[in-house]
């Protein structure tokens, strides 16, 4: 079966693994997925991410993060811009997620950025997802 939205698939795999408190998960790799995973790591939503070469597409192994009492760090993930309905914002329209408690991930001309980084650089782009 052809996958129409690999980013949504990655976010769903993270959401599902997080709900059952798995330590790690694997997703097929791509440059965009790798950059999104690096942002999640940098922002403290996941513990680590590593790329595994398999002479094909490659695999991203994502290590999930939980609090001291095994509470989830990621409480929500939502895909915003979809293949059937793209969502673009201008620099002054970059959204805040839960008043700054979450992040919006944007695809801009300067790469994949968080909402905060996009505001600092004064750039808009495609809103990929919200994470909180």
UniProtKB/Swiss-Prot annotation:
Q: Note whether NAD occurs among the keywords.
A: no
Keywords for this protein: Ribonucleoprotein, Ribosomal protein, RNA-binding, rRNA-binding
Q: Name one GO cellular component term.
A: ribosome
MF GO annotations:
rRNA binding; structural constituent of ribosome
Instruction: List this protein's GO terms for biological process.
Output: translation
Going by the entry's taxonomy, the superkingdom of the source organism is recorded as: Bacteria
Query: InterPro entries under this entry?
Result: Ribosomal_uS8 (IPR000630), Ribosomal_uS8_CS (IPR047863), Ribosomal_uS8_sf (IPR035987)
Instruction: Tell me the function of this protein.
Output: One of the primary rRNA binding proteins, it binds directly to 16S rRNA central domain where it helps coordinate assembly of the platform of the 30S subunit.
Q: How does it assemble?
A: Part of the 30S ribosomal subunit. Contacts proteins S5 and S12.
The UniProt family comment states: Belongs to the universal ribosomal protein uS8 family.
What the entry lists under NCBIfam families is as follows: PRK00136.1
Q: What is this protein called?
A: Small ribosomal subunit protein uS8
Species of origin reads Geobacillus sp. (strain WCH70)
Q: Which gene is transcribed and translated to give this protein?
A: rpsH
């Amino acid at each position: 079966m052809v996958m129409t939205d690999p980013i949504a698939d990655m976010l769903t795999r993270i959401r599902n693994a997080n709900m059952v408190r798995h330590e790690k998960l694997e997703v097929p790799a791509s440059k965009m997925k790798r950059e999104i995973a690096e942002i999640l790591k940098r922002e403290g939503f996941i513990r680590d991410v590593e790329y595994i070469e398999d002479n094909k597409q490659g695999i991203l192994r994502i290590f999930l993060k939980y609090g001291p009492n095994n509470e989830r760090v990621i409480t929500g993930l939502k895909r915003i811009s979809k293949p059937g309905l793209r969502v673009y914002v201008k620099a002054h329209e970059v959204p805040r997620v839960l008043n700054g408690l979450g992040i919006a991930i944007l695809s801009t001309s300067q790469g994949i950025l968080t909402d905060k980084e996009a505001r600092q650089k004064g750039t808009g782009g495609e809103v990929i997802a919200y994470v909180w």
